């Protein structure tokens, strides 16, 4: 059994879809590291520290989940964390092509690192951070898509 898995992402912001996948991963693996990518090329709305804090709030009830920010190659971060599995989410068939390319690239960079794909529950399958930010930016209510603390943080960002 794989003991340690990494669920990487930008999480800008963390959504109920992400939380759903984290819950599922926490049941499958002894320890799950949520790797929050610094990824400055995406121009995140929240700083890395803010994203780490929000994810810690969202996952506080899960004893086997740890939240860590990182920069650089994911395969290097996985090695540093002694993880042998990457958890990735698939919302729709359209996600598969990109995720398939990523999985193959990661496998080339580290043949011992496996990618496992999880799907969120149906009610969370359409949620994306991009859509949540767009709704919030235009003054819409995002409370059904994110944790209450994330909703507050989005409101404070304006």
UniProtKB/Swiss-Prot annotation:
Catalysed transformations (reactions): (R)-4'-phosphopantetheine + ATP + H(+) = 3'-dephospho-CoA + diphosphate
Binding-site list for ATP:
10-11, 18, 89-91, 99, 124-130
Q: What protein name is recorded for this chain?
A: Phosphopantetheine adenylyltransferase
Among the record's GO biological process terms, what is one? coenzyme A biosynthetic process
Give the species: Shewanella woodyi (strain ATCC 51908 / MS32)
Q: Which InterPro entries match?
A: Cyt_trans-like (IPR004821), PPAT (IPR001980), Rossmann-like_a/b/a_fold (IPR014729)
One Pfam family it belongs to: CTP_transf_like
Q: Which GO cellular component terms, listed alphabetically, does the Swiss-Prot or TrEMBL entry include?
A: cytoplasm
Q: Recite the UniProt keywords alphabetically.
A: ATP-binding, Coenzyme A biosynthesis, Cytoplasm, Magnesium, Nucleotide-binding, Nucleotidyltransferase, Transferase
- List of residues binding substrate: 10, 42, 74, 88
Q: What GO terms are given for molecular function?
A: ATP binding; pantetheine-phosphate adenylyltransferase activity
Pathway membership: Cofactor biosynthesis; coenzyme A biosynthesis; CoA from (R)-pantothenate: step 4/5
The main location is cytoplasm
**Entry similarity comment:** Belongs to the bacterial CoaD family.
Record's keyword annotation contains Transferase: yes
Give the source lineage, highest ranks first.
Bacteria, Pseudomonadati, Pseudomonadota, Gammaproteobacteria, Alteromonadales
The site annotation (Transition state stabilizer) covers 18
Localization: Cytoplasm
Quote the HAMAP family the UniProt record gives.
Answer: PPAT_bact (MF_00151)
Give its E.C. classification number: 2.7.7.3
Q: What role is this protein assigned? A: Reversibly transfers an adenylyl group from ATP to 4'-phosphopantetheine, yielding dephospho-CoA (dPCoA) and pyrophosphate.
Q: Which cofactor does it need?
A: Mg(2+)
Question: Subunit comment for this entry?
Answer: Homohexamer.
């Amino acid at each position: 059994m794989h003991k340690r898995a990494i669920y990487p992402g930008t999480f800008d912001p963390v959504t109920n879809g992400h939380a759903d996948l984290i819950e599922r991963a926490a049941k499958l693996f002894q320890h799950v590291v949520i790797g929050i990518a610094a990824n400055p090329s995406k121009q995140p709305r929240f700083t890395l520290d803010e994203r780490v804090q929000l994810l810690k709030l969202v996952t506080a009830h899960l004893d086997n989940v740890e939240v860590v920010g990182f920069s650089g190659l994911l395969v290097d971060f996985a090695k540093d964390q002694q993880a042998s599995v990457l958890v990735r989410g698939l919302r729709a068939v359209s996600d598969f092509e990109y995720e398939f390319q990523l999985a193959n690239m990661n496998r080339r960079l580290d043949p011992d690192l496996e990618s496992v794909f999880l799907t969120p529950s149906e009610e969370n399958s359409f949620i994306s951070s991009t859509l949540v930010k767009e709704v919030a930016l235009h003054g819409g209510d995002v409370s059904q898509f994110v944790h209450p603390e994330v909703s507050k943080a989005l409101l404070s960002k304006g």
